[in-house]
Amino acid sequence: MRDIRLIRAPSNLGLRPLRPGHVPGTWRGPEALAGLVEALAPVAVVDLERPAYSAEAEPGTRLRNGNAIRRFKLELADVVAKAIGRGEWPLVIGGDCSLLLGALAAARRSGPVALVHADGHSDFRHPGNYDVNAMLGSAAGMDLALATGRGEALLTEWPGIAGPLVADEAVVQIGERNSRDPDFAWADINATPITRIDVFTAREMGAVAVLEKTSAALARADCPCWLHLDVDVLDQTVMPAVDSPGSPGIDPDDLVAMLSPLAVDRRCIGMDMTIFDPDLDPTGELARRLVSLLGRIVRPA
């Protein structure tokens, strides 16, 4: 059984406020998911300090909280890299999706890395597909674009790493639910070598076939991989406590069947789980559901 280092990263920096004065509640995710300590029996728990959130623009960047995001991701990268160096398996609990950048920056210190991006959205917004002067960018909706080198240098260039955090060819995106909409915001992802399995295709193929296609893409990449799980990949009837809920979504049992074999594979060097908002879970029922789900993925019976 692998040694898990549980890294709790209480960040909401990459999210937009949903209304004036709103502060996204994802920063409370790690605390609400405290049951993971008992469920996963990690060898250690690391708590990062919550960074201050601001909804306002700042000089030198069109990314909301851009400078704070970079600082926090560099801190996270150091913690994740130390875990990998010890032979442990870092599990980062957020927090918003921009945490992925810090995790990948850590993984890349040891060489190329592949990425399985399980998310109800491709998070591929970048200056090539929206007007940066019309609105502030939210890094949590841009994480895959940033990870593949598209966007401001503030979040695409990292110390000691040449090129993007991950190559297009080494990415598998699972679960996008808006890709067939006529106004799909980042249709340019379709012109990339990223392996894309939208939610409709995933449901048609079934979990076994999705796993086979994902595994084949990872074999071609031929390098260690990182797993990213945004819990909005689940249907909103199952997991409504997220920033951008939607339907359809991946069935929880299917998600376990798709991700658990990847998580326990020796070439998987870590995982993050993001976007759960406890403010939208007043009873704690959804938090308990996520603890159970993650336990099934990373500690299968």
Specify the residue positions occupied by each region the protein language model found.
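Conserved alpha-helical scaffold segments that buttress catalytic/binding sites
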Residues: 2-301
